[in-house]
Protein backbone atom coordinates (compact mmCIF):
# COMPACT_ATOMS: atom_id res chain seq x y z
CA UNK A 1 0.00 0.00 0.00
CA UNK A 2 1.15 3.52 -0.78
CA UNK A 3 0.30 6.51 1.39
CA UNK A 4 -1.61 8.99 -0.75
CA UNK A 5 -2.36 11.52 1.96
CA UNK A 6 -1.92 12.39 5.60
CA UNK A 7 -4.00 14.95 7.48
CA UNK A 8 -4.20 16.09 11.08
CA UNK A 9 -6.52 18.55 12.80
CA UNK A 10 -6.80 19.78 16.37
CA UNK A 11 -9.61 21.82 17.88
CA UNK A 12 -10.26 23.40 21.23
CA UNK A 13 -13.35 21.75 22.73
CA UNK A 14 -14.29 25.00 24.51
CA UNK A 15 -14.87 26.68 21.12
CA UNK A 16 -17.41 23.99 20.27
CA UNK A 17 -19.07 24.32 23.70
CA UNK A 18 -19.51 28.08 23.15
CA UNK A 19 -21.08 27.47 19.73
CA UNK A 20 -23.48 24.91 21.17
CA UNK A 21 -24.70 27.29 23.88
CA UNK A 22 -25.90 29.62 21.11
CA UNK A 23 -27.23 27.12 18.59
CA UNK A 24 -26.95 23.57 17.28
CA UNK A 25 -26.43 24.89 13.75
CA UNK A 26 -22.76 23.82 13.76
CA UNK A 27 -23.74 20.26 14.70
CA UNK A 28 -26.32 20.19 11.90
CA UNK A 29 -23.71 21.45 9.42
CA UNK A 30 -20.92 19.07 10.46
CA UNK A 31 -22.73 15.85 11.38
CA UNK A 32 -24.58 13.43 9.12
CA UNK A 33 -28.06 12.27 10.17
CA UNK A 34 -26.54 9.12 11.69
CA UNK A 35 -23.96 11.11 13.65
CA UNK A 36 -26.55 13.71 14.69
CA UNK A 37 -28.71 10.98 16.27
CA UNK A 38 -25.72 9.89 18.38
CA UNK A 39 -24.86 13.52 19.21
CA UNK A 40 -28.41 14.15 20.47
CA UNK A 41 -28.09 11.28 22.98
CA UNK A 42 -24.42 11.73 23.88
CA UNK A 43 -23.38 12.48 27.48
CA UNK A 44 -20.72 14.93 26.24
CA UNK A 45 -22.07 16.44 23.01
CA UNK A 46 -19.39 19.15 22.64
CA UNK A 47 -16.61 16.57 22.96
CA UNK A 48 -18.37 14.27 20.44
CA UNK A 49 -18.82 17.11 17.94
CA UNK A 50 -15.24 18.35 18.39
CA UNK A 51 -13.85 14.89 17.65
CA UNK A 52 -16.04 14.52 14.53
CA UNK A 53 -15.09 18.01 13.37
CA UNK A 54 -11.37 17.25 13.76
CA UNK A 55 -11.77 13.90 12.00
CA UNK A 56 -13.52 15.40 9.00
CA UNK A 57 -11.01 18.25 8.73
CA UNK A 58 -8.14 15.74 8.92
CA UNK A 59 -9.76 13.67 6.16
CA UNK A 60 -10.06 16.58 3.73
CA UNK A 61 -6.49 17.64 4.54
CA UNK A 62 -5.33 14.11 3.74
CA UNK A 63 -7.07 14.41 0.38
CA UNK A 64 -5.29 17.74 -0.18
CA UNK A 65 -8.38 19.91 -0.40
CA UNK A 66 -10.61 21.75 2.02
CA UNK A 67 -14.22 21.91 3.05
CA UNK A 68 -16.09 24.12 0.62
CA UNK A 69 -14.18 23.10 -2.52
CA UNK A 70 -17.06 20.91 -3.61
CA UNK A 71 -16.62 18.89 -0.42
CA UNK A 72 -19.08 19.01 2.46
CA UNK A 73 -18.71 17.83 6.05
CA UNK A 74 -21.58 15.51 5.11
CA UNK A 75 -19.29 13.67 2.66
CA UNK A 76 -17.31 12.12 5.54
CA UNK A 77 -18.92 10.01 8.26
CA UNK A 78 -17.16 8.69 11.37
CA UNK A 79 -18.24 5.35 12.83
CA UNK A 80 -16.92 3.17 15.63
CA UNK A 81 -16.48 -0.58 15.79
CA UNK A 82 -17.85 -2.29 18.93
CA UNK A 83 -14.27 -2.12 20.27
CA UNK A 84 -14.40 1.68 19.96
CA UNK A 85 -11.97 1.84 17.03
CA UNK A 86 -13.05 4.60 14.63
CA UNK A 87 -13.38 4.18 10.89
CA UNK A 88 -14.49 6.43 8.06
CA UNK A 89 -17.12 6.21 5.33
CA UNK A 90 -16.94 8.53 2.34
CA UNK A 91 -19.82 9.79 0.21
CA UNK A 92 -20.56 12.07 -2.75
CA UNK A 93 -17.66 14.23 -3.99
CA UNK A 94 -15.18 12.87 -1.42
CA UNK A 95 -15.87 9.28 -2.53
CA UNK A 96 -15.56 10.32 -6.20
CA UNK A 97 -12.17 11.92 -5.60
CA UNK A 98 -10.96 8.83 -3.73
CA UNK A 99 -12.01 6.66 -6.66
CA UNK A 100 -10.30 8.97 -9.17
CA UNK A 101 -7.08 8.86 -7.12
CA UNK A 102 -7.32 5.09 -6.56
CA UNK A 103 -7.58 5.55 -2.78
CA UNK A 104 -8.94 2.27 -1.43
CA UNK A 105 -8.38 2.45 2.32
CA UNK A 106 -8.24 4.92 5.17
CA UNK A 107 -6.98 4.88 8.72
CA UNK A 108 -8.01 7.26 11.48
CA UNK A 109 -6.94 7.99 15.01
CA UNK A 110 -9.02 10.29 17.20
CA UNK A 111 -8.11 11.44 20.68
CA UNK A 112 -9.27 14.00 23.18
CA UNK A 113 -7.88 15.36 26.39
CA UNK A 114 -9.40 17.91 28.74
CA UNK A 115 -9.32 20.93 26.36
CA UNK A 116 -8.56 19.54 22.90
CA UNK A 117 -9.67 16.98 20.34
CA UNK A 118 -7.28 15.78 17.64
CA UNK A 119 -7.57 13.46 14.66
CA UNK A 120 -5.13 12.06 12.11
CA UNK A 121 -6.18 10.41 8.84
CA UNK A 122 -4.08 8.39 6.40
CA UNK A 123 -5.38 7.60 2.90
CA UNK A 124 -3.81 4.72 0.95
CA UNK A 125 -3.84 3.22 -2.52
CA UNK A 126 -2.78 -0.31 -3.53
Swiss-Prot record:
Known catalytic reactions: apo-[ACP] + CoA = holo-[ACP] + adenosine 3',5'-bisphosphate + H(+)
Keywords recorded for this protein, A-Z: Cytoplasm, Fatty acid biosynthesis, Fatty acid metabolism, Lipid biosynthesis, Lipid metabolism, Magnesium, Metal-binding, Transferase
Locations listed in the record: Cytoplasm
Record: residues binding Mg(2+): 9, 57
Key word Transferase present: yes
Entry keyword annotation includes Secreted: no
GO biological process: fatty acid biosynthetic process
Enzyme class per UniProt: transferase
A Pfam family this chain is assigned to: ACPS
EC number: 2.7.8.7
Cofactors required: Mg(2+)
Protein function: Transfers the 4'-phosphopantetheine moiety from coenzyme A to a Ser of acyl-carrier-protein.
Family indicated by similarity: Belongs to the P-Pant transferase superfamily. AcpS family.
UniProt name for this protein: Holo-[acyl-carrier-protein] synthase
Organism: Pseudoalteromonas atlantica (strain T6c / ATCC BAA-1087)
Gene: acpS
